[in-house]
């Protein structure tokens, strides 16, 4: 079973990807990991990608698709795989179909923007230890202080409301169109169309996990 997991930053994809990977014994595949492995192995595609990256460019889709084709032939993908952060564009999704790389399931984790902003902008971190808190969901015993050391907690630049809103805009502009693309494919029902499921991403992590696994088992 090959799965693509879609959803905005902060929707909980990382947590759920781990659960899916464990439940179905399939590896998570990220383009970043594939690129690093190919460069390290000095494969033909890896060297082509390295040349582009060294020049500060974006690795073109044909190289990425080539890496995907190689990766899914490896032994650990015998049961399938879970694509993490790929495809990002409709062009990449089209290229997967053109190359005959069949996808079985699309899972969208749906969380409204305001909920994501609340989740992400409420995070606080103790820099020295990496301990994380949340002002609503997991507050420290004393506001703004680490439970163990009593030292100040900080908000990372990535977690400010302004930054989160910018990241959400990029997602809506660039990646969200994929949701419509795959939803329409499922409605059309062509032979190579993956099954599309929209999962409510608000609630207990365990319930969301069960909803996703149930959708994948249907």
Swiss-Prot record:
Record's protein name: Adenylate kinase
GO BP of this protein: AMP salvage
GO annotation, cellular component aspect: cytoplasm
Pfam families reported for this sequence: ADK (PF00406), ADK_lid (PF05191)
Region (LID) location: 122-159
Protein origin, superkingdom: Bacteria
Binding site for AMP: 31, 36, 57-59, 85-88, 92, 156, 167
Role this protein plays: Catalyzes the reversible transfer of the terminal phosphate group between ATP and AMP. Plays an important role in cellular energy homeostasis and in adenine nucleotide metabolism.
Free-text note on domains in this protein's UniProt record: Consists of three domains, a large central CORE domain and two small peripheral domains, NMPbind and LID, which undergo movements during catalysis. The LID domain closes over the site of phosphoryl transfer upon ATP binding. Assembling and dissambling the active center during each catalytic cycle provides an effective means to prevent ATP hydrolysis.
EC number: 2.7.4.3
Reaction it catalyzes: AMP + ATP = 2 ADP
Subcellular location: Cytoplasm
Keyword field: ATP-binding, Cytoplasm, Kinase, Nucleotide biosynthesis, Nucleotide-binding, Transferase
Binding site for ATP: 10-15, 123, 132-133, 203
Positions of the UniProt region annotated as NMP: 30-59
Subunit composition and interactions: Monomer.
Family to which this protein belongs: Belongs to the adenylate kinase family.
Pathway membership: Purine metabolism; AMP biosynthesis via salvage pathway; AMP from ADP: step 1/1
A Gene Ontology molecular function term of the record: adenylate kinase activity
Gene: adk
